[in-house]
């Protein structure tokens, strides 16, 4: 085989490998969309919702975890994203209060089982935990890829913004729940707004049991350093939104810069996204 033919063969092999990688990869977004607060003025949900939908459609995640979504927001997203379904309930066990809903592209994934627990000493009951200001929940499901039939557990949560003890104990509870639920050691993702910065002890506790998605990523962070913007146009440095994983390959990790589609932020958090292979 001459040099030209060898080079052509090598390019074909590389292209095929790249195609397989792309075909098997899955995009997952975690997004605190800022609850629909009637006292918000220019940042009112009605002024933001269509831009949020545009961002989601542009990035086309197979799985989408939402924090701070009230029922009217969840319903709106559900109505705009064709082929998507979701799991999750409100903090009251029905439709009131914040959801930690998980949307999924039903053409790509199926849900085998799902549930929600409360971040408290009585996780199976509607309850508020420790020094938390509000009831807090974690919604999870076992998702099956319809092509490969591979399965992955996904947990979505939003820790309390006031209770320091609650945040610490929420980590311990979730790790306990993961051990109880994931008895077959399937790949796993924990995502959400944890209201914790990377140096805080509860984050270190998570890292002792799960992989930090950013540290595991095959490529450097794409986008701003932080995730919380507070609707300010200043540099974003505060990181409180995360992906933690187990038994997964992270191809890329992104803090999506919403200013690329809008002159102002469309939530007080940036959406974060990973591309995974498993």
PLM regions and their residue ranges:
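A structural micro-motif
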Residues: 26, 84-85, 109, 152, ...
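Active-site beta-strand/loop signature of hydrolases that rely on acidic residues for catalysis
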Residues: 26-33, 52-77, 103, 141, ...
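Solvent-exposed loop/turn segments at secondary-structure junctions
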Residues: 33-36, 70-73, 91-95, 108-109, ...
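Metal-dependent phosphoester-hydrolase catalytic domains
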Residues: 165, 169, 176-188, 196-278
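N-terminal, active-site-proximal structural segment of metallo-dependent hydrolase catalytic domains
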Residues: 2-9, 18-80, 91-98, 172, ...
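Short, well-ordered secondary-structure micro-motifs
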Residues: 41, 77, 84, 165-167, ...
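Acidic/histidine-rich helix-loop elements
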Residues: 30-50, 119-133, 160, 225-234
